[in-house]
């Protein structure tokens, strides 16, 4: 009797950020497609270099994630670029060239929004989504650490989704990963299988997400130019998070567990792991400012210089304690809190010192479950009461 099982060999160090070398390993057909891809990106760069100063863009491409289920496709089942909200001119051109990629982009944005809500569900700003062009409301226009996290997570979502779509054969211009064999993989282990195409996912996300910022030209050293640099930095940090958390996974094949053959491939981490990683980066984000030469520099010289994988921000976070429509803050009134916690989810911090209300709540749940032969589980319904604490 044959047996097989999957295990992770090594995480993080195995997969390096050597993307150009990986692309050179492609077949001639894939290389030709990649050459066309780079030509397109070059055209975008040329067009944006001489662009005049443009006003802030209306909306954000991240809104695609909110429309993923109902408005993404036309009658032929192909994404309609005209129907996609918040795209810049460069993103619209990429959409027209890579229409089959837009479902993956929207899925990536969708999972980023869901992950943002999960990671911040017990914080003062809980990643509330608003039905407007900016998704998060006016708060996303503030160069805060919350904005840095949201943009990084969205960029990571595109890498993650496109890389998986390549592996699953959903896109015409890419397939399984062609990453070279890791040097530290055991000699008798076979490097193959169909791995997630991180290389392609990274490059496509870089072009699609960043072209929006590269089209915007502002006077060197201005706050507007600094915001563009901040966005580009955090976009890159998000993409690198997916690379950082990726792993080499191996499968053992053999009769009766003999493990006579081991095959290995490149695999994405779960997006929850990426979200956890970026949340830690959010907690350690570095405040920066733009200097006269048009470069970002740390505001406090005593702080360690951030790497390309770290998040940066330019403005302090607004007051999320009270409702403020001007900045898009919903406040924390009515939010459920943890009375016994001393962390940010505790009633003292989450309620901003305003106190909290306590209500008795009755919960019905299954209990005392027993297995009955054959083949069902019988349970009783138990009723219990619990205290629910909400911010005043």
Predicted region positions:
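Long, position-biased, composition-driven segments near the start of the mature protein
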Residues: 34-36, 45-349, 353-392
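Classical eukaryotic N-terminal signal peptides for Sec-dependent ER targeting/secretion
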Residues: 1-41
């Amino acid at each position: 009797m044959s047996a097989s099982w999957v295990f992770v060999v090594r995480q993080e160090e195995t997969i390096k950020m050597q993307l150009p070398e990986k692309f050179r390993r492609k077949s001639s057909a894939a290389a030709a497609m990649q050459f066309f891809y780079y030509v397109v990106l070059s055209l975008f760069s040329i067009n944006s270099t001489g662009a005049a100063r443009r006003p802030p863009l209306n909306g954000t491409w991240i809104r695609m994630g909110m429309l993923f289920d109902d408005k993404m496709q036309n009658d032929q089942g192909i994404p309609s670029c005209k129907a996609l909200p918040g795209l810049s001119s460069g993103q619209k051109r990429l959409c027209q060239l890579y229409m089959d990629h837009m479902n993956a982009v929207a899925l990536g944005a969708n999972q980023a929004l869901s992950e943002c809500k999960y990671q911040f569900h017990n914080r003062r700003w809980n990643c509330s989504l608003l039905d407007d062009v900016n998704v998060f409301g006016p708060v996303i226009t503030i160069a805060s650490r919350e904005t840095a996290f949201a943009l990084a997570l969205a960029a990571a979502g595109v890498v993650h989704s496109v890389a998986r779509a390549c592996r699953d054969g959903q896109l015409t211009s890419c397939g399984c990963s062609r990453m070279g064999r890791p040097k530290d993989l055991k000699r008798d282990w076979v490097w193959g299988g169909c791995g997630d195409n991180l290389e392609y996912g990274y490059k496509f996300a870089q072009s699609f997400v960043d072209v929006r910022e590269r089209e915007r030209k502002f006077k060197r050293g201005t706050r507007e130019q600094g915001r563009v640099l901040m966005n580009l930095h955090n976009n890159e940090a998000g993409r690198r998070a997916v690379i950082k958390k990726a792993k080499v996974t191996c499968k053992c094949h053999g009769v009766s567990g003999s493990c006579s053959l081991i095959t290995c491939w490149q695999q994405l981490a779960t997006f929850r792991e990426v979200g956890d990683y970026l949340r830690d980066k959010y907690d350690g984000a570095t405040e920066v400012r733009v200097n006269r030469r048009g470069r970002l520099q740390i505001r406090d010289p005593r702080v360690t210089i951030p790497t390309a994988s770290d998040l940066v921000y330019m403005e302090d976070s607004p007051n999320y304690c009270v409702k403020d429509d001007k900045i898009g803050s919903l406040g924390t009134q009515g939010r459920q809190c943890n009375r016994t916690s001393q962390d940010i989810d505790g009633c003292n911090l989450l309620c901003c010192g305003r106190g909290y209300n306590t209500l008795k709540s009755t919960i019905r749940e299954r209990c005392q479950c027993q297995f009955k032969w054959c083949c069902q589980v019988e349970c009783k319904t138990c009723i219990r009461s619990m205290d629910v604490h909400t911010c005043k």
